[in-house]
Structure formats: structure tokens, C-alpha cells
Amino acid sequence: KIAIPLEEGILCSHFGHCQQFAIIDADGKNITGLTLLTPPPHEPGLLPGWLAEKGVTDVIAGGMGQRAINLFNERKINVFVGAPIKPPKDLASDLLNDTLSAGANYCDH
């Protein structure tokens, strides 16, 4: 499952203060579903655990603090930051097809 923070339906550049998250299900390189979830009220360190509970394995973000990146990595969730401002299905498709132009890839493997 891929999580993407959204504002006005596209990638939100400020991870911790987004309006919604797109949770995208995929099978291989194919998107099989998209669910929109409203995050709990912002608290530092809360979102990595909340998304882990949803079964998320990858996060695509515009910008994210190092503490959040570390918390995701502790939960074995891959983080891709510096992604372009695009609709969530486009970003997920780019990730699944290894064409995502992110500035950095923070993963534990």
C-alpha cells in the first residue's frame, strides 16, 4: 500500500499538515484501489504509526522532516521525498513503474 499526503486532490508539499491521505492498493505494477482517509489531528510522530496501522509499505511525499523519516524507517516503511506535485494515481503509477522522480529515497533495504 502506498500513502500520499493530499491537499486539494494533489500531492501536499507539507507532509504533516495535509488534508487527506490517498491510500493506494497495488498488485505488481497495477493500481487496484484508492481510498481517501482524513488523518488524525497533527501531533509530531503520530502519522507514521497511524499509516503503519493501515498497512502502508511506501510513502510518497513532497517534504518531510528527518524525525518522521526515521519513524517510518523503524516501521519498515519506504519513504520517497521531493516528489513532484501531481495527482496520487500518477505518483503511485510512477513509483510502481520505477519512474518516480523523487529527490531522495529513504528506505531500509
Predicted segments, located by residue:
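Short Gly/Pro-enriched loop/turn and capping motifs at secondary-structure junctions
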Residues: 42, 64-67
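C-terminal structural segments of small proteins and small subunits
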Residues: 66-109
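Conserved SAM-binding loop
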Residues: 60-61
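Short acidic active-site motifs
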Residues: 10, 46-47, 87-90
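N-terminal first-folded block
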Residues: 1-39
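Short acidic/polar active-site loop segments enriched in Thr and Asp
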Residues: 57
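Compact, glycine-rich, soluble single-domain proteins
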Residues: 33-54
